[in-house]
Amino acid sequence: MQSERQKYIRNFSIVAHIDHGKSTLADRLIEATGTLTEREMDTQVLDNMDLEKERGITIKSQAVRLIYKRDTGEEYTLNLIDTPGHVDFNYEVSRSLAACEGAILVVDATQGIQAQTLANCYLALDNDLEIVPVINKIDLPSARPEEVKQEIEDVIGIEAEDAPLVSAKTGLNIKDALEAIVSKVPAPYGDEKAPLKALIFDSYYDSYKGVVCHIRVKEGTIREGTEIKLMNTGKVYEVVEVGVFVPNYMPVDELKAGDVGYVTASIKNVRDARVGDTITEAKRSANEALSGYRPAVPMVFSGIYPVDGAKYEELKEALEKLQVNDAALSFEPETSIALGFGFRCGFLGLLHMDIIQERLEREFNLDIITTAPSVIYKITKTDGTLIELTNPTNMPSPSEIKLMEEPIVKSSIITPSDYVGAVMDLAQNRRGIFKDMQYLDTTRVSLNYEIPLNEIIYDFFDALKSRTRGYASFDYELIGYKDADLVKLDILLNADVVDALSMIVPRERAYAKGRNMAQKLKEIIPRQMFEIPIQAAVGAKIIARETIKAMRKDVLAKCYGGDISRKRKLLEKQKEGKKRMRQVGSVEVPQEAFMAVLKTEE
């Protein structure tokens, strides 16, 4: 059932590979529809975190309402939902897409289709969205729009003959893109009188309003004073304000089926308004929630410790504040012998981890040490119990382990054909299993591998970029677990295990990794007054050793000539002292040592 009002609404999002000009296109659409005045326009209006502007990436989903007047005089309401393009934030993208009826697929006219173009495009197709291809950056001399159109038709299989050719930077042909949205994206359906059903596609904490939920109303009507219930948590709230974004808040009386807007209901914590949850009326609730909700599952874990132990409480507060805004971040307290008190934090992926670390340092002025990231291993013990291991320190002894499984990802790498050899070599070094390859055109190949997640969480992306001169693109998704022969590699300094440096590695690589780490630590740890043995061990077996020599004073300087026994006495005395020192001395491990562990030998 479609009302007259709904015929003039279009809900769409923009999907693209990183840096193909998604946020810039959003800026031009905002400008072309006169949503903001010239003075208010700022580059990348929708990326409002400093970090987003600096890295030039979109992290949180955003929404904005545009009013577009056609030449025929009809007025359309376009709700644009800007989504992140990075693979870590896939769940953010999928929920934003569920709030739309159509998606603009932005493809760079100079680069063509990249790995994430495909991944995001398939996500959009999974949500049954109408896909409108738009070819961007046609102002560049190296643009090849006709070839890219052909590529879109061949690789993705959607009609691209009349795709608008635009330049988001200069604002060329933006009107064509707006026309394409109005004519190709379907209008929303939904009964305005049915019980309320609204999808939360983003939520964040505002210090004045409490949690602000970005919602797409699928059925029914929501207005101020409505008693609402969140279907997955079952909590009931009263609506304080509903409104729309013009990117800033603009309160309205009500939101009806088909609308996109925000709602506040003095909710205190983002965890209570999970993204993907369904809002309904408390008194007249819908029978079932909207499908597709799944809580965000962290894939990568890392320990975060304050450099100064006294700042533990501050770190805890900072993490709690970030968590209010980021439902995907999880943390729990843990202690390390080497680093004291800290937290084991779970992240969606490496970029997410990087951003959280940077925000802790920037917004909260904290000095932190982070340990090597690790993934979740599943261990079946001999007595049949199953444990999920996120911290290598807690690994049970080998005699108790019956089976150990590690997460495997399906990855697709798109690379120029000249570099296929180098990429295959890299994937094999990382224990990748080759699945298939296909030529996208004469110069580019898509390779599909199954790779253990553990192998890509450190520096796979950097290694891939450096081997292909920055041309390859990469995308991955978790497909499941597979059993593996893994051991725990411990590092001992002065015969003490440094728990924060422990890591889980495949058995056949333990020796090489141990050697490598011992050598790296020897370069990084400063010399002390006594000699320090650095040992790498698997279980009770030492597999590699390096020694940091002691700094010593020349005790023979004052002996000129004279008897050898006198010199020997002084040397023996010095040796005794160093030995005593070694028994009581402790070794300070600098932050660089923890980082060095991550960089594997390429």
From Swiss-Prot:
- Family of the protein in this entry: Belongs to the TRAFAC class translation factor GTPase superfamily. Classic translation factor GTPase family. LepA subfamily.
Membrane topology of this protein: Peripheral membrane protein
Does the record carry Hydrolase as a key word? yes
Output the superkingdom of the source species: Bacteria
Name of the protein this chain belongs to: Elongation factor 4
Record's GO cellular component terms: plasma membrane
Q: What residues does GTP bind to?
A: 19-24, 136-139
Its source organism is Clostridium botulinum (strain Loch Maree / Type A3)
**Functional note:** Required for accurate and efficient protein synthesis under certain stress conditions. May act as a fidelity factor of the translation reaction, by catalyzing a one-codon backward translocation of tRNAs on improperly translocated ribosomes. Back-translocation proceeds from a post-translocation (POST) complex to a pre-translocation (PRE) complex, thus giving elongation factor G a second chance to translocate the tRNAs correctly. Binds to ribosomes in a GTP-dependent manner.
Give the enzyme class.
Answer: hydrolase
**What are the subcellular locations of this protein?**
Cell membrane
Q: Which GO terms describe its molecular function?
A: GTP binding; GTPase activity; ribosome binding; translation elongation factor activity
